[in-house]
Amino acid sequence: VPGVNILHSKDLVNWEQISYCFDRFDFNDPAFSLVGGKEVYGQGVWAPCIRYNKGKFYVFTNVNGKGLQAYIADDIRGPWKHVMVKGNIYDLSILFDDDKIYAIHGYGSVRCCELKPDLSEPVPGTDREIIPEGTGVGEGHHMYKINGMYYLISTDYKPNGRTLCSRSKSIWGPYETITITADETYGYHPGPMTEVKGRIVDNGTHIKIKMPNHNATACTNAHQGGIVSTPDGQWWALLMQDFHSIGRTVDLMPITWKDGWPFIGLEGNLGRAPRTWEKPSTGAKVEPRAPYQRNDDFNGKTLQRIWQWNHNPDDKLWSLKGGKLRIESMPASQLLWARNTLTQRAIGPVSQTIVELDINNLKDGDVAGLGNINMPCSWLGVVKNGKSIKLQWFQQVDNDTITIDINPKKGKLWLMLDGDYDNDCAQYKYSLNGSDFIPAGNKITLSYQLITFQGSRPCLFAFNSKGKRGGYALFDNFKVIEPKADRSQNIPWGKTIRIINLATNLPAEATRHGVLYDTSRGNNRPSTHFRLIDTGNGKLIVQCADGRYIMASGIGMPGDVRMTNDEAQAEVFMYQDYLDHEFMLMSYNRHTYLCKSPTTGSPYSVDCKGPDPARKNGSVFKWEVVE
């Protein structure tokens, strides 16, 4: 909490966080406050649905064990009125249609019912099955009425994630169903997964982290979300994908209508979507911006909006005073049971989370520091036993603890969580002067799990391990450093490069015969040297050092990628940035990718639909500057 995050955008690319639907759970249940040995990790807000109708905003969501909740506001910034909706309705979509309110829900067997105007409960006798089990339809429904037809966007995760569309002339059916996107992982494989029985993971519990199959898609496919139209008639999808230990992320994907179906992707490559494409044409001129203000010096009267507590906080035991965040310690056996733990989602692909910690007011048994709320959890903090002050590193997988002697000046030190979320690992560090950081403990493996479904969440915490109320910790100057946020230098404009295929680790060569092929790693002739020439708006052509250009003929099969002396015949590509010098080249007009099979011995083609999860199907490259 706060819960149900509301963001706003005028261009579907640059978003601003503007409100939450509620500040705290208002159920009379101690579990939502982490009291009495009860907890609700991962049991809060599920699958929200936002709608606008007749001047009001509506958000519908499920809370496990509490049923369907509705939040209503005249202004998207709030305040929001809370209504509890009776009935067994979950993972729903809402459709306002002809003065009626329909709720569509269920997995496999999809049901629809009409809700009463006050949203108190379904209209008796209206609940019925509209899509039977056995049609391949899953859950996560989004219902739309477009040009008189009813379209239901849904997802399935058995055996892997994909997005489906069902359509009918009547909301009650019958429906026909097709897949509108599958296998679009953007070249990302699944990450490590925590395998553990039960709910909250207590210290000493046997925890297994299953390492991923790099060739599988699993739920790294873009697979669940909704669609939206722009004022000029473009259609776009916003779908989520499971993205390693970072948790679930949102993809913006173009839609192409064909035969009355909203396929994800572009006309020449339906079902797959580009990693980089032209912005939606909404007519709004918006400067690039980050959706969240992650840094917090705690000088304000309120916390930055991005912060969320792990459960309902005890507001009497935390405060903002003197430009610092004060968290008073309460009894807890370990981090996951610690109340008033303040968290925000980790940001990838790499980031360093740093905070300044004042330990002068800790008491016997207090533990305070910087951690990662996940299962398993980890932390680096100061432990006070009697008059002894030690720095302690802890990771829950092996119940490992490492203690470090420290002598912080004026009772102040700095803690860092240095996370590499692309490679699912992190290193804790500490500093006694705020600038020179020393590794603490071992590098830890970061994982994803299906208890909270949220991935890694850096957190600030203070608790007492000896079962009593303790002192308090003061936190200051929280900041998140994102070394790869500036992508302006990622495309090697003005550089002479070699194009190395990740599948074979071999460079491309413009052969004398006129086709593009691979060559030995040691071949550094000019025929292996290329320049990317900017033609505007993310588009480019590729020129060899001998003056020829890459072109594509026919339907782009192997051998159709050739060399030409005529710049006007050069194939126009759109650069697909994968960071760390890795990239793809998508034909701007064909919507398929430059590729060379790593196994057949064929020359280059431009007919690849997209990368595989391991980036080893011959469509992903790495550029090297020619010295």
What feature does the model see in each segment?
Residues 1-490, 527-531, 570-572:
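Carbohydrate-active catalytic/glycan-binding domains of CAZyme proteins
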